[in-house]
Amino acid sequence: MDKIVIEGGVPLRGSVDVSGAKNAALPVIAAALLAEGEHEVRNVPDLADVRTLGKLLGHMGCEVARGEGDRRTVRLRVPAAVAPEAPYELVKTMRASVLVLGPLLARLGRARVSLPGGCAIGARPIDQHLKALTALGAEIRLEHGYVNASVPRGRLRGTVFTFDAQTVTGTENVMMAAALADGETVLRNCAREPEVKDLGDALVAMGALVEGAGTDEIWIEGVPSLRPLSHAVIPDRIEAGTFLVAGALPGNDVTVRGCVAAHQEALVEKLRAVGAEVTKVEGGLRVVGDGRPRPVDVRTAPHPGFPTDMQAQLMVLLCLADGTSRITETVFENRFMHVQELIRLGAHVEVDGRVAMVKGVPELSGAPVMASDLRASAALVLAGLAASGTTEVLRVYHLDRGYERIEEKLAPLGARIRRVRG
């Protein structure tokens, strides 16, 4: 099993490029199931989750390949007859596999999809997906770990539905289903993440009638059919945010190219509050970590609030602050699993339910640590960069689900980091 080895305490200087957003690429690729033909999705990161979705679509009868000479382009050929099943063997490692449910129901009128897996950071049930699809006219049964769904009337029908809680994949799944439904659908209390808007843009490019994607209310007028997809996904705001935090670590000066400043407002506000210098530059943002950080209080929230996917990374910065910070996690339960590993590096963190009190220490010291989930693994890499001595991050298969060769991006900045194949 691979591990990342870091010799920490070295200042980072230079520029790093952001890959395409995994959480935008996955629903856009799933949307290809809505239309027969040849599709092209650009700016797609080469990540384990993307490869898993490619295998899943291949299992359904689609042809999926990276472009020759352009590994960031994924080309798909979707046949008229698609096998409407997502087996457990493929779905178990990736929660986003459930995104095929809406497109399959909309186009084929039936689907059998295993209940999803992914990071173990809370229950994250798909009940909102199923309630909304039922409101669109689907009949759904949960049997033997599978969602068995059908549309007795042949086509889904438009509806007005209010999500009980904001859900990104739920919003995306129902958007795709409603694109081919009969009549008008109005979705309320929708997730407002940039990835939702990106999917809306992709659906419109396919001929769908969608308005309001990226706001809390989305209007969709179903159409009889859609045309093949051609779309470039947005940059990954969480990868960009991770590099921005790296730049804010004491003594660092990092320019993150390709990030969208509007997607980083909540994070940038906190980075400036801790004392980092953040400036807009052509094509991105520059962050300078000037001295020891100041403590801040952080509360995660759905977009446009502070992203839960950046909570662990920011905690690393606050572990070095001159004072005590408070982090409140409101989005997911059980999302402080990285704390025990940070304590191994010398951090002083106490957790009480959904609140972590972070008492800053002058420095961290390297040690072997084990990743528990995707964003925790990124936090441990950041901690290893800041710590003195050697840090080994184990179970980096979590890291590879969401970061495209992170060690190769950090090394040109001066980081002494390498992957050891196991």
Curated annotation (Swiss-Prot):
It catalyses: phosphoenolpyruvate + UDP-N-acetyl-alpha-D-glucosamine = UDP-N-acetyl-3-O-(1-carboxyvinyl)-alpha-D-glucosamine + phosphate. Keywords: Cell cycle, Cell division, Cell shape, Cell wall biogenesis/degradation, Cytoplasm, Peptidoglycan synthesis, Pyruvate, Transferase. Its EC number is 2.5.1.7. One of its GO terms (molecular function) is UDP-N-acetylglucosamine 1-carboxyvinyltransferase activity. Its main location: cytoplasm. The active site is at C119. It comes from the Bacteria. GO terms for biological process: cell division; cell wall organization; peptidoglycan biosynthetic process; regulation of cell shape; UDP-N-acetylgalactosamine biosynthetic process. It is found in: Cytoplasm. InterPro entries: Enolpyruvate_Tfrase_dom, Enolpyruvate_Tfrase_sf, MurA_subfamily, RNA3'P_cycl/enolpyr_Trfase_a/b, UDP_GlcNAc_COvinyl_MurA. It is an enzyme of class 2 (transferase). Disulfide bonds: none annotated. Pfam families: EPSP_synthase (PF00275). Phosphoenolpyruvate binds at K22, N23. The modification 2-(S-cysteinyl)pyruvic acid O-phosphothioketal is found at C119. GO terms for cellular component: cytoplasm. NCBIfam families: murA, PRK09369.1. Cell wall formation. Adds enolpyruvyl to UDP-N-acetylglucosamine. Belongs to the EPSP synthase family. MurA subfamily. This is UDP-N-acetylglucosamine 1-carboxyvinyltransferase.
